[in-house]
Curated annotation (Swiss-Prot):
The modification N6-(pyridoxal phosphate)lysine is found at K51. Its EC number is 3.5.99.7. GO terms for biological process: 1-aminocyclopropane-1-carboxylate metabolic process; amine catabolic process. GO terms for molecular function: 1-aminocyclopropane-1-carboxylate deaminase activity; D-cysteine desulfhydrase activity; pyridoxal phosphate binding. Coiled coil: none annotated. Belongs to the ACC deaminase/D-cysteine desulfhydrase family. This is 1-aminocyclopropane-1-carboxylate deaminase. The active site is at S78 (nucleophile). HAMAP family: ACC_deaminase (MF_00807). It holds the Pfam family PALP. It catalyses: 1-aminocyclopropane-1-carboxylate + H2O = 2-oxobutanoate + NH4(+). Its cofactor is pyridoxal 5'-phosphate. The gene is acdS.
Length: 338
């Protein structure tokens, strides 16, 4: 496998820490050892997150093309767009963000706090669009890029989650290589890695990275899109493309992509009672904050799988914390009383 042939622009502090979740593990019976790899603490750029790791491989391409404007898309409370805005500010580039109405949640301050507030503070041109949630290339995003061209700018396209970008899976191939180095220091290997999946490139990169040592199917994706067939197809397609890029040496097959579809509801961006319980439990036992859109759902999935005995006794499970806490203030109605 050859990830090193791709240029990388450093935006993160370095390897993200692995934290034992001792109190949560004990609360769930102590038969499974839970750990978290803190991608939510990976950068000084506006709280970082998993997209910052991906953007390290997109930035060299943007600079090589002479782009002057990063153009990205997400929901109103998109973590992706906040991270793109931060990277643009860091590089001295312009930034245009399309923020679509992906979540059916009504709150008078929803489009004025959290991620979107931070993006505005960093100077991004934020454009609210009424289109609803879907996965894939969006017309509103293409129109935003054309508007930059018409104004004489040179846009660089960054799709939702970086996922439809040809280089979008590379960052989390690097995640797997980083975990292997940390495992050598820890003296053990993780039996499972749990990760939230929506647009797919985070899990896709992990699948490729862990395929290098035979653990592709030990990456357990927790769907948060509530459109699992689209998500599964996108993960598989991105993983196959990424495997070719890094010269993995074998094909990615359907069995490599494991996606648990039980925790994505009731719909994208809206939490179930189980998700809210998981968010509060993790916060109160570990002081670790997760959000109702992404990480709360993957935390719910991991907790439930432990309770149901779906991880063998003695298993060591690594939870990939991808970020998301900056969106919590947008859900203040749900968490008014904690």
């Amino acid at each position: 496998m050859n990830l090193q042939r791709f240029p990388r622009y450093p935006l993160t502090f370095g390897p993200t820490p692995i934290q034992p979740l001792k109190r949560l593990s004990a609360h769930l019976g102590g038969k499974v050892d839970l750990y978290a790899k803190r991608e939510d603490c990976n950068s000084g750029l506006a709280f970082g997150g998993n997209k910052t790791r991906k953007l390290e491989y997109l930035v060299p391409d943007a600079l090589a093309q002479g782009a002057d404007t990063l153009v990205s898309i997400g929901g109103v409370q998109s973590n992706q767009t906040r991270q793109v805005a931060a990277v643009a500010a860091h590089l001295g580039m312009k930034c245009v963000l399309v923020q679509e109405h992906w979540v059916n949640y009504e709150d008078p301050v929803y489009d004025r706090v959290g991620n979107i507030q931070l993006s505005r503070m960093m100077g991004a041109d934020v454009r609210l669009v009424s289109d609803g949630f879907d996965i894939g290339i969006r017309r509103s995003w293409e129109e935003a890029m054309e508007s930059v061209r018409q104004a004489g700018g040179k846009p660089y396209p960054i799709p939702a989650g970086c996922s439809e970008h040809p280089l979008g899976g590379l960052g989390f191939v690097g995640f797997a290589e980083e975990v292997r180095a940390q495992e050598a220091q820890l003296g053990f290997k993780f039996d499972y890695v749990v990760v939230c999946s929506v647009t797919g490139s985070t899990q896709a990169g992990m699948v490729v990275g862990f395929a290098a040592d035979g653990r592709a199917d030990r990456v357990i994706g927790i769907d948060a899109s509530a459109k699992p067939e689209q998500t599964r197809e996108q993960i598989t397609r991105i993983a196959r493309h990424t495997a070719e890029l890094v010269e993995l040496g074998r094909d990615i097959v359907e069995q490599d992509v494991v996606l648990d579809t039980r925790y994505g509801g009731p719909e994208y961006g809206l939490p179930s009672d189980g998700t809210l319980e998981a968010i509060r439990l993790c916060a109160r036992l570990e002081g670790m904050l997760t959000d109702p859109v992404y990480e709360g759902k993957s935390m719910h999935g991991m907790i439930d799988k432990v309770r149901l005995g779906e991880f063998e006794p003695g298993s060591k499970v690594l939870y990939a914390h991808l970020g998301g806490a900056p969106a919590l203030s947008a859900y203040n109605g749900i968490f008014r009383n904690g």
